[in-house]
């Protein structure tokens, strides 16, 4: 079962667990909840178990928002050390394509959305060949080809990972609902904003500007 913007449950338990992080979180916890960032799937992998906060009665796994917030902050710091033009962000998933494109536009990165052409990272004669220093993927399952190529040439991989994702070839995980429209736009916006803050460059975008109209 995919996690979408529908069926978002904001529970008293989740809110209570987040109270202690409210003052230091990148956005108010309610914004994470409203966007459904915490909503996982009815499947979980061993890799993602440490990021799971609880299991709902309907079998849906709920992600720990504090972990998401902390990971966005630390990974933004990591990414800020790279030349933005050497950062590649990809998304085969439809709802991730517009946020990924806006991320690249706002920080000066490169985006490849939609179908990823095999060989784009490994074949120098391939049209559209690019040698990034780091890759960001929206979903390790949908963007598996990108990850395979990045691993083959030794490029670190940052991935937005849901409860059902395998992370064996991912270097840095951002635990999040990576299927919902609002969740993806908020996470990509926060990541871009924090990179801009780390690099001390202007960032004049609202979260709503990262949300696809589809």
Swiss-Prot record:
This is Small ribosomal subunit protein uS2. Belongs to the universal ribosomal protein uS2 family. Disulfide bonds: none annotated. The lineage of its organism: Archaea, Methanobacteriati, Methanobacteriota, Stenosarchaea group, Methanomicrobia. Pfam families: Ribosomal_S2. GO terms for cellular component: small ribosomal subunit. One of its GO terms (molecular function) is structural constituent of ribosome. CDD domains: RPS2. One of its GO terms (biological process) is translation. InterPro entries: Ribosomal_uS2 (IPR001865), Ribosomal_uS2_arc (IPR023454), Ribosomal_uS2_CS (IPR018130), Ribosomal_uS2_euk/arc (IPR005707), Ribosomal_uS2_flav_dom_sf (IPR023591). It comes from the Archaea. Keywords: Ribonucleoprotein, Ribosomal protein.
